[in-house]
Amino acid sequence: MNLHFITNVQLKNIIGKDLINNDNIAILELVKNAFDANAKRTDISFVNLKNNDDLSIEKYSSRTSRLIIRDNGVGMDINDIKNKWLNIAYSEKKKKSYQHNRMMAGAKGVGRFSCDRLGEFLNLYTKKEESSEFILLQLNWRQFEVDDEKKEIQDVVLEYEILSTTELEMRGIKPFKHGVVLEIIKLRSQWVYWEQPKWNTEKLVNLRTYLERLINPNQAFEKNDFGIYLNAPEFEEENKNAEEKAKFIGRIENSVFEKLNFKATSIECEVQDNGATTLTTLKDKGETIFWIKEKNEFSDFIKDAKCIIFYLNPYSKAFFTKQTGIRPVNYGSIYLLSLIHISEPTRRVV
């Protein structure tokens, strides 16, 4: 006699809001999915955080709190939605760890359940570049939150619609050439709260800091740029102070190296003058101690290069780990690179 596992409808909670127990992690996973889809830009927008009807309405309206994550990646067609997005634990990362000239960043197939962690409803809009129509998939996560031992997750029927550009605009979504828009509605967490004499936006500030981890500090040298933008229109209109606004609104940059300049000792070497010279600068806590400009003996091979080596004391190491979530020894340690060269002398380390 053969047996098999049963996927009870409560599986959604186990791999959704119960597993992903942090809002920042949930949003980061969704941004990683956009990165893996070759998006050049991802916009994260919070709507109706201050005044909404979340507690007074059963479903949702135009005044209900929303988190909208929009990317310009490759997008999906109905086969992608059916065979990939709705296929629990399906992950492109399992098949290939590198695509679109990028190392894939997403988790192993459960990132889409981050939407459940963040809100009660989801409207997923998507379009591939070659298509003239938009696909809308609607999910009400409450449909999976029933106490029924016999009901399996595949018993919940999900419907999709094909939308024209006009129909998309009527739903308040700006048309796009390709990509995905996740409209997460009726947010489960309180992202801001009133604290006399102003709104406390610390949770949004913390999100911005957390998302910096996905941005390469060396992005200026990367061919494939990836931008993350955080928006909260209610507070952008209200807050006229540019410095305060920059804490959680606008493009997210990883400034860890810039901050390290004022907390560590560094040696910076840059090839200049089309490879003719090298400029070496020694700095301590942001102050130049010594510099020297010399002839580049390898001008035939190196025309344009820049290298910065930081010496981190215990305080600087702790700061780096707090900012990036990575121990310095696991990020760019000279000792680590030496081990790679010894074990794989032909491998190029960039």
PLM segments and residue spans:
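GHKL (Bergerat-fold) ATPase N-terminal catalytic module, capturing the glycine-rich phosphate-binding loop
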Residues: M1-S189, Y193-W194
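Compositionally biased amphipathic helical and low-complexity segments enriched in hydrophobic
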Residues: K50, N313, L337-I340
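Short, hydrophobic, well-ordered secondary-structure elements
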Residues: C115-D116, S333, L337
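Residue-level signal for short segments within beta-strands and strand-turn junctions
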Residues: T126-K128, L230-A232, E344
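A short, sequence-level motif marking secondary-structure junctions
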Residues: L139-D147, K245, R251-F257, H341-I342
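Glycine/threonine-rich ATP-lid/beta-loop region of ATP-binding domains
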Residues: G172-S333
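Single conserved hydrophobic/aromatic residue that forms the stacking wall/gate
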Residues: I340-V350
